[in-house]
Amino acid sequence: RQAYLEGGRPVIIPSAEGSTFGGKMFPSVVAFTKDGERIVGDPAKRQAVLNPENTIMHIKRKMGTKHRVNIKKKKYSPEEISAMVLQKIKADSEAHLGVDIEKAVITVPAYFNDNQRQATIDAGKIAGLKVERIINEPTAAALAYGLDKEGEYTVAVLDLGGGTFDVTIMEMDNGVFDVISTSGDNNLGGTDMDDALVDYLADLFKEENGIDLRDDQAARQRLHDAAEKAKIELSNTLKSTINLPYIWSDSSGPKHLEHDFTRAKLEDIVGPVIAKCEKPIKQAFKDAKMKPGDVDKVILVGGPTRMPTVQEAFEKFVGRKAERGVDPMQCVAMGAAIQAGVLAGDIKDVVLLDVTPLTLGIETEGSVMTVSYTHLRAHETVV
């Protein structure tokens, strides 16, 4: 998602050919066609079933690692794949605004470490962008929510994205955004729910036919797309039908998969994933020296938080109803635009005080990290 500032207000920039949520969502998917053409975003996602071996998804979890993607006998780093997504976002934004874009504020999960943050900056450079600031996603969401809010509030931001989960507790006081604590899990998100649903469907098919669809890339991608679609539908309905004709064929003939999903069954399957979110939430409150229920406002961020079962679980964990006037899909990009406006001097009287999510230290003999509380900032220190 990308946004810019117009008249002091953040505005979402739609992707050029996007169909996801009216073009206001940009899938971080990169693919290479048989002819070697590179496609990014919605077009890449749409062709994934027919070209799974040359389609890259979920690269965010690999940022800052030595992981390499092998496509058509060429190796790509996570930074290079991420840069391809940023290049497409940059091109769409330039086409929409009619100006060249050279600088950007980029958001990252709050619990990203230094390697992951530097990798994000490197991706921006490869894409032709000077990264003016890296800002934590929950903090950006709070900026979007609290820009025009007067008074003093303590806010908990729960950000459940596709691949990561972050919890940030902050104080908002008439334009001052002071982060008290942050916690998270960089390997927990909506993707894990999709995987759980895929496993459920694959196990059903295997039980009936003796075939594991997970062993076939194309069949697995069809399962994933169907699971994701059902998950979204069941946020608004109580029943969804998965119908995948000709998902397999062998000497005995074609085989189909049809299954009626209820919201109750969905909640049962994804429940263990949601339960894992409780630990980072408790840690954030512990670091803030607060108890659940002490906060005045709760903001939910990220696509999976549109699910009623996620909303109910998070409200139970925190002990307070979530705010309903926040768009969980767009507020992070809008917050990044606000931060860009602050840096450019277009927005006044906004002060952001964030913390280090991880402890800083020095490596001593034997590859041991030594933390010096007198000279080096410790975990949860304001910077």
Regions found by a protein language model. Give the residues of each.
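Oxyanion-binding/catalytic loops of NTP- or PPi-dependent enzymes
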Residues: R1-T65, V69-K75, M84, A91-R377, ...
